[in-house]
């Protein structure tokens, strides 16, 4: 049972009070009474507006539902457009918007590179992600399917030299392409040395050569005659050639190269939202404790692997000698953002005097900013932001009014924490239809603090389906990726960012590669996101970050953005094209395949969320391909099933039968997990199964199609069930 203490007119969970007063506040210069007084003021001022914005969402949705019910058949675009303008769904487009954000770190403003998103409540994942600033290309290639396992190149229990040869060949091809020599190849190199402030490479023939572009050599470790690391720079990203004649790999290399290490995940989003299951004070404090450990540089994780105990901690900065003899260092860790939750959910961690839960997004904003003040004051082992900023990603906002509300919240947080105005920077997730259609107006509301806009295909598709739920049955889920609205949405996001002056000042991001085991496919496809104008894109693992970094060497992002900067196209008409099925004459087999795929993904994710508190995991799909699943993937799958159910493509009985059958499949896929509770043994008593079923059967009733209300309630129900079993 949660215990609370009265703090002013608030009831605050004892666990949070203890954490704030004993861990988070000391060293910030803020007195506890002043802090809690400020929290009370913010909640009193902003909670009513938060509620009003959510009520407006529901009012708009009900109005749109009614319009579609009244206007059946093919949509009259002109009438539809006028209707959306009348109800304020489509806002006036501001003519000129230029962002003026100051004190933005180079990883955001100057460099282009991969971005990781990781659940902050998992210390090991969070540390691995922060440390993924640098990654071994040899390891990434050897352990992934980028290198084929054909012709004796299998990944075996011990090192496979034949596979290793292919890895080294790929890596040295990368060096030749990215850092070409005036003559010869890195494959022919037998020695790297520094002479007269230049990198000199000796080839097998005895000939000495240099880099075609000598400015690419920027530093080294060791001595000039016998360096242990050569540091190179291309397209703003660093690459290390690591040399060690005693290393097993270096020993067999002509030039004694043991590895090639790439600057990889420039930025990491430490997530409190979609990849996290945090439903009570214990969970929220665990989230905040890890964020504090990251900000102070003290976070550690101990785990057992192959029978051995291993420890992870944050990496130190990397020191080098410049060609002119001066020493310098580069960050050893990603620049960290923190993603707060959106405006929807409330939390039992703080209640009002009348017992009402307070908005979780307000609490996240206050506590994560308080914790980040330690970085601003340089209280930690390392510095996250060298420019004195705090980077907060704000998700799931609908239209400019909600973005303006987030801005006011940030203003008030800065006031109570004693921070200069616009210290708190905002990343705006463009993942809701009303934001996509009004993105320029949204940017205008935060033009002095925005550092990031990002498209999110999955959440955005979930909102696309829910908004137009009453319009008719949607196309199959797999066909969404080639739909016209989605292409326009992606192009519109880039155009808005560049028109508003993001180049050289802020990130324009693209979405996640969701198949962490299919790295060769990622290498073939993900470069298109940079060709489309993004200067960062999401990856699911440190390995993926290192491999995706190669795309930023292949594509010069600033030059691409320059060619796209004049795009003044208004994409509204295309974005408003609802992805309705022109014909619903799918075969029974096609319909069942769609149901099976959706049901299996829903159950595979929900069972871990509800019964293990895991908010992000690799979930095998119907074809046993491992997919990174979080609440965004759950939203699209549950809304798609709910849409087909609503329009009679499938029946309620068919949905239930499919879910029951797929529960057995998911049970089999999880058979090796000792913590797993099978669903199919007792479907009525399985909290996870009932949650998954509810997400579909009551999908049309969920606010904007979000899954959080059901997940949170069912997770708390399961926790209470376990507590009773232990008594």
From Swiss-Prot:
InterPro entries: Malate_synth_C_sf (IPR044856), Malate_synth_sf (IPR011076), Malate_synthase_TIM (IPR001465), Malate_synthG (IPR006253), MS_C (IPR048355), MS_N (IPR048356), MS_N_TIM-barrel_dom (IPR046363), MSG_insertion (IPR048357)
Pathway membership: Carbohydrate metabolism; glyoxylate cycle; (S)-malate from isocitrate: step 2/2
Entry's localization field: Cytoplasm
GO CC terms: cytosol
Cofactor(s), names only, from the UniProt record: Mg(2+)
Catalysed reactions listed for this entry: glyoxylate + acetyl-CoA + H2O = (S)-malate + CoA + H(+)
Top-level lineage group: Bacteria
Keyword terms, alphabetized: Cytoplasm, Glyoxylate bypass, Magnesium, Metal-binding, Oxidation, Transferase, Tricarboxylic acid cycle
Entry EC no(s): 2.3.3.9
PTM-bearing positions, type Cysteine sulfenic acid (-SOH): 616
Main localization, broad class: cytoplasm
GO biological process, one term: tricarboxylic acid cycle
Residues reported to bind Mg(2+): 431, 459
Positions annotated to bind acetyl-CoA: 117, 124-125, 275, 312, 540
Binding site for glyoxylate: 339, 431, 456-459
GO molecular function: magnesium ion binding; malate synthase activity
Keyword presence, Membrane: no
Active site, renumbered: 339, 630
Record function comment: Involved in the glycolate utilization. Catalyzes the condensation and subsequent hydrolysis of acetyl-coenzyme A (acetyl-CoA) and glyoxylate to form malate and CoA.
PANTHER family: MALATE SYNTHASE G (PTHR42739:SF1)
Subunit (UniProt): Monomer.
NCBIfam families linked to this entry: malate_syn_G, PRK02999.1
Record family assignment: Belongs to the malate synthase family. GlcB subfamily.
Name listed for the protein in its UniProt record: Malate synthase G
Species per Swiss-Prot/TrEMBL record: Halalkalibacterium halodurans (strain ATCC BAA-125 / DSM 18197 / FERM 7344 / JCM 9153 / C-125) (Bacillus halodurans)
Species classification: Bacteria, Bacillati, Bacillota, Bacilli, Bacillales
Gene: glcB
């Amino acid at each position: 049972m949660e215990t609370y203490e009265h703090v002013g007119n608030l009831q605050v969970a004892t666990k949070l009070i203890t954490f704030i007063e004993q861990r988070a506040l000391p060293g910030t210069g803020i007195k506890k009474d002043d802090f809690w007084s400020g929290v009370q003021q913010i909640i009193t001022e902003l909670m009513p507006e938060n509620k009003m914005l959510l009520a407006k969402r529901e009012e708009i949705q009900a109005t749109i539902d009614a319009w579609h019910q009244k206007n059946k058949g093919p949509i009259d675009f002109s009438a539809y457009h006028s209707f959306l303008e009348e109800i304020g769904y489509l806002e006036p487009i501001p003519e000129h918007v230029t962002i003026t954000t100051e004190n933005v770190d180079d990883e955001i403003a100057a460099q282009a590179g991969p971005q990781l998103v990781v659940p902050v409540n998992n210390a090991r994942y969070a540390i691995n992600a922060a440390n993924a600033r640098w990654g071994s290309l040899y390891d990434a290639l050897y352990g992934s399917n980028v290198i084929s396992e054909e012709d004796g190149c299998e990944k075996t229990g011990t090192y496979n030299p034949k596979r290793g040869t292919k890895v080294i060949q790929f890596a040295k091809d990368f060096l030749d392409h990215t850092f070409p020599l005036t003559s010869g190849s890195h494959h022919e190199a037998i020695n790297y040395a520094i002479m007269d402030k230049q990198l000199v490479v000796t080839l097998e023939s005895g000939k000495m050569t240099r880099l075609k572009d000598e400015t690419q050599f920027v530093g080294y470790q060791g001595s000039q005659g016998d360096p242990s690391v050569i540091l190179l720079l291309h397209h703003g990203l660093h690459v290390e050639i690591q040399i060690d004649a005693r290393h097993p790999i270096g020993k067999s290399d002509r030039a004694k190269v043991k590895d090639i290490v790439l600057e990889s995940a420039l930025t990491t989003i430490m997530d409190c939202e979609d990849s996290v299951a945090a439903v009570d004070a214990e969970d929220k404090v665990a989230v905040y404790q890890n964020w504090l450990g990251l900000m102070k540089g003290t976070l550690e994780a101990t785990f057992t692997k192959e029978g051995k105990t291993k420890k992870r901690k944050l990496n130190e900065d990397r020191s080098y000698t410049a060609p002119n003899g001066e020493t310098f260092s580069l960050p050893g860790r990603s620049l960290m953002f923190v993603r707060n939750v959106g405006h929807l959910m409330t939390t039992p961690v703080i209640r009002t005097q009348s017992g009402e839960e307070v908005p979780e997004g307000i609490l996240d904003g206050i506590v994560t900013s308080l914790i980040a003040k330690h970085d601003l004051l340089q209280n930690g082992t390392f510095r996250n932001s060298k420019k004195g900023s705090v980077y907060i990603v704000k998700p799931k906002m609908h239209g400019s009014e909600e973005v303006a509300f987030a801005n006011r919240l940030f203003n008030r947080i800065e006031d109570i924490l004693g921070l200069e105005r616009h210290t708190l920077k905002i990343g705006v997730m463009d993942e809701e239809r009303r934001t996509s259609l009004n993105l320029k107006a949204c940017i205008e509301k935060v033009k002095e603090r925005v550092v990031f806009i990002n498209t999110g295909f999955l959440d955005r598709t979930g909102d696309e389906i829910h908004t137009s739920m009453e319009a008719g049955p949607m196309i199959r889920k797999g066909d969404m990726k080639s739909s016209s609205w989605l292409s326009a949405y992606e192009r519109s996001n880039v155009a808005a960012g560049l028109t508003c002056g993001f180049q050289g000042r802020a990130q324009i991001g693209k979405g996640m590669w969701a198949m962490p085991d299919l790295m060769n496919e990622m290498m073939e496809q993900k470069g298109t996101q940079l060709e489309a104008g993004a200067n960062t894109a999401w990856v699911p693992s440190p390995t993926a970050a290192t491999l995706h970094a190669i795309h930023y060497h292949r594509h010069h992002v600033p030059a691409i953005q320059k060619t796209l900067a004049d795009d003044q196209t208004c994409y509204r008409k295309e974005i408003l094209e609802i992805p309705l099925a022109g014909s619903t004459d799918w075969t029974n087999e096609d319909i069942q395949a769609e149901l099976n795929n959706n049901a299996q993904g829903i159950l595979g994710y929900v069972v871990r969320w509800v019964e293990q508190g895991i908010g992000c995991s690799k979930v095998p799909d119907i074809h046993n391909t491992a997919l990174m699943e979080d609440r965004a993937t759950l939203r699209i799958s549950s809304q798609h099933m709910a849409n087909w159910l609503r329009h009679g493509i499938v029946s309620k009985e068919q949905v239930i039968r499919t879910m029951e059958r797929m529960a057995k499949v998911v049970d089999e896929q999880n058979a090796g997990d000792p913590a797993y509770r099978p669903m199919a043994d007792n479907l009525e008593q399985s909290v996870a199964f009932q949650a998954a079923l509810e997400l579909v059967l009551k999908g049309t009733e969920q606010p904007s199609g979000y899954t959080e209300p059901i997940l949170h309630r069912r997770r708390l129900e399961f926790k209470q069930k376990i507590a009773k079993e232990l008594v």
